[in-house]
Amino acid sequence: AIFILAS
C-alpha cells in the first residue's frame, strides 16, 4: 500500500 500525506 502507498500512503501519501500532503499538507
From Swiss-Prot:
<keyword id="KW-0588">Pheromone</keyword>
<dbReference type="GO" id="GO:0005186">
    <property type="term" value="F:pheromone activity"/>
</dbReference>
<protein>
    <recommendedName>
        <fullName>Sex pheromone cAM373</fullName>
    </recommendedName>
</protein>
<comment type="function">
    <text>cAM373 induces mating response of donor cells harboring pAM373.</text>
</comment>
